Amino acid sequence: MTSLNDIRSTFLDYFGRQGHAVVPSSPLVPRNDPTLMFVNSGMVQFKNLFTGVEKRDYVRATSSQKCVRAGGKHNDLDNVGYTARHHTFFEMLGNFSFGDYFKEDAIRYAWELITKDFGLDKARLYVTVYHTDDEAFEIWKKVGVPEDRIIRIATSDNFWQMGPTGPCGPCTEIFYDHGEHIWGGPPGSAEEDGDRFIEIWNIVFMQNEQFADGTMVPLDMQSIDTGMGLERIGALLQGSHDNYDTDTMRALMEASAHASSTDLDGDQNVHHRVIADHLRSTSFLIADGVMPSNDGRGYVLRRIMRRAMRHAHLLGAKDPLMYRLVPALVSQMGQAYSELGQAQALITETLKLEEERFRQTLDRGLKLLDDEVAKLPEDGNLPGAAAFKLYDTYGFPLDLTQDALREQGRTVDTDGFDAAMAEQKAKARAAWSGSGDAADATIWFDIAEKNGVTEFLGYDTEVAEGQVLALVVDGARVDKVASNQDVIFVTNQTPFYAESGGQVGDSGTIRTETGVLHVTETRKVAGVFLHVGQVTEGTIKVGQGASLSVDHERRRYICANHSATHLLNEALRWAIGDSVVQRGSLNSRDRLRFDFSHNKPMTADELAQVEAEVNDLITRNTAVETRVMTPDDARALGAQALFGEKYGDEVRVVSMGHHAGSGKGLDKDTYSIELCGGTHVKRTGDIGPFVILSESASAAGVRRIEALTNQTASFYLSEQNERMGQLAAELNTQAADVLDRVKALKDDRKKLENEVAQLRRELAMAGGTSAPEAASVNGVNFHAQALSGVTGKDLAGIVDEHKARLGSGAVLLIADAGGKAAVAAGVTEDLTDRLSAVDLVRAAVAELGGKGGGGRPDFAQGGGKDAANAEAAIAAAKTVIEGV
């Protein structure tokens, strides 16, 4: 049987032989496209090539693209597990031409691949063309498809548009006939929705540009975009019409069945299908840098996770299940996607943690859903308010509730749910509103196309000469700028580092023969460095020569923080394990911030170990080395990379420190090796002192460390030392003895507090108001007393002393705490079978302006707003005793 891995390789190898660049899949998180939640097709990473705003060193490409469809317009989540071809995660095989070949070659390549390399029966293949696309019709005839199997389609199914305006063009699709034993008709027929004729490949001919008025003109650059789902063609080549019968999906489902000790087929099958699919999407999303959260992409990830976890619950799994399936996934797909193996520890830890948390509420949430359903008529649907309560209180996404109700033939009032969710949706929309930059990205692409990308000189120098290529004010290009104008300044080369990889951009000064620019920040778009600042003297014109000078002191501090971050990252891995993965960072002038995956607070000992190890590496003052190499060579050395980052053919590798047990580097003794494009110190000693300020939660499963280095750390330590001296003087001791002195003071205070409490109890036992002596009520010795000068905390001990004195009986005490009442009651063990202290407290509290009260039959506590009603409260408690 041909495996999915073999099919993927066959596809890519075929187009590689046809001169296509084999381009790796992009991460699932789109770059520079805030309108798209996840990559959902093969063309996404090539979008700027199709629109002409970007150029690369190839004009034809092929890829197997990771895709997720679980939100927004393309949302397959509800159907996953119940149909043969719906997935949240799938791979899209594609070949692309950017102004190179067009219809004839695209059709010829497709036909040759599927009939020769894949060996599909030509007699079972049908094709569709757009009804006016005579050219495609004739090409299909030319390659050998009979006219009666070339179907003209007049609907939008065979006409592709990027949007209301922009590139568009007709499509041609290839269908496979599974045979008469399966219901359905050919495309365009009344029975086309059946499963007999299945589309396996879509080929888009981008040949026109559409304008807002509906007119179309031919594109100057005509292109090809194709897509073929790997799972769909895999099912066909493996003799099935169900994607879940493919070898990869079957292996994951078998792993699910084994881990849950359940049958693979029968009633359990749908659960295993959901788990297998969702395992792929969640694992790849985590590997590409998405973590579960309550908004944005992280919320979609959490929804997918929790849907799978509910199906694991329905299988009867008593313990977390998903994380135990990760090795099976890595075994199936890790060779094609190395990021799975690299992120395996993080994926495993994240899945386990999320499932442990969700299982704590799942049973309660499902019980609440059952209670709500029990109130409904036989064919009633769940009100939106109830569904929102599940979401708001128990973290149940709407689709999880819908999924649970689906099995009962019920639905949810989604309009009611949407109304309850309006505020959250508004916040979510605001979060996706984009960066708000005045200048459209096309400006920078135009500059890059005309002048090339900016050459960065800042690894070797902080001063350089350049030429002014562009000036941008309020989103528009201008020829010159005058004093006090804010401007974005572009040169052909620069020593200024542009913000990226967690490192802030440089600031400094740029001078021309006629003016001076103060640079406050440096950014980068499409390889163009943007110097953002204000003209402080004279005027500056496009075409002038420029002298660029980076703020040396600021850069020095930033470099120290960035290099320290590398050492911190590795020290954390040594201290708490390989599950530590960088989740974010900020390296600024003043401090560094490092976010990392970890599911609990670090201990004081762990933090001390990390801080000491980083400082030890700093004091060794070893050289910081940088080399440029291929990503594969870097990984072979053990270099750490950021999950979700896409790297080019060459990467910059930063190495520092030595550790005999590291196993990394050429000599297997390098402490830290990371792929990094930032600027760093020359030697570790240049970092200076390293001080951890804090460790805290940043998000679920993510911790954050903030730290100082260099002179900032020295100032901090000096300030702390000064404060310690002041504290020692205040305590009349030496700095080294401050801790012992504080402990002694705390012990003295505790002793005095105990003595005061004992005195209050003795005073309370000796007097007070309202029946200082016990009275017999219904045969029960009852001591009731309103006290002053005691606190609520004192009452428990006083109640116990009165119970001991009575031997058999009940006690009620009310303390006046600044006008409010603290109440405590006790009943001796011999009476608790017929009298409860809880009932006494509740009766008393009701008279004191309070509610409730609780505890055990032998002791209970409560409180009220008005201690002045103590007499009425005692009388109410007495009534309770009289009634037993």
From Swiss-Prot:
List locations, semicolon-separated.
Cytoplasm
Q: Which GO terms describe its cellular component?
A: cytosol
Q: Which cofactor is essential here?
A: Zn(2+)
GO biological processes: alanyl-tRNA aminoacylation; negative regulation of DNA-templated transcription
Copy out the cofactor comment. Answer: Binds 1 zinc ion per subunit.
Q: Which molecular function terms from Gene Ontology are attached?
A: alanine-tRNA ligase activity; aminoacyl-tRNA deacylase activity; ATP binding; tRNA binding; zinc ion binding
* Main location, first listed in the record: cytoplasm
Q: Which SMART domains match?
A: tRNA_SAD (SM00863)
Q: What positions does the entry give for Zn(2+) binding?
A: 562, 566, 676, 680
- On the tree of life, the source organism's domain of life is Bacteria
Top-rank EC class of the record's enzyme: ligase
**Parts of the chain that traverse the membrane:** none
The protein's annotated catalytic reaction(s) are: tRNA(Ala) + L-alanine + ATP = L-alanyl-tRNA(Ala) + AMP + diphosphate
Sorted keywords for this record are:
Aminoacyl-tRNA synthetase, ATP-binding, Cytoplasm, Ligase, Metal-binding, Nucleotide-binding, Protein biosynthesis, RNA-binding, tRNA-binding, Zinc
EC number annotated for this UniProt entry: 6.1.1.7
Q: What's this protein's function?
A: Catalyzes the attachment of alanine to tRNA(Ala) in a two-step reaction: alanine is first activated by ATP to form Ala-AMP and then transferred to the acceptor end of tRNA(Ala). Also edits incorrectly charged Ser-tRNA(Ala) and Gly-tRNA(Ala) via its editing domain.
- What's in the domain note? Consists of three domains; the N-terminal catalytic domain, the editing domain and the C-terminal C-Ala domain. The editing domain removes incorrectly charged amino acids, while the C-Ala domain, along with tRNA(Ala), serves as a bridge to cooperatively bring together the editing and aminoacylation centers thus stimulating deacylation of misacylated tRNAs.
Protein family (similarity comment): Belongs to the class-II aminoacyl-tRNA synthetase family.
Q: What is this protein called?
A: Alanine--tRNA ligase
Whose protein is this, by species? Jannaschia sp. (strain CCS1)
Q: Which gene encodes it?
A: alaS
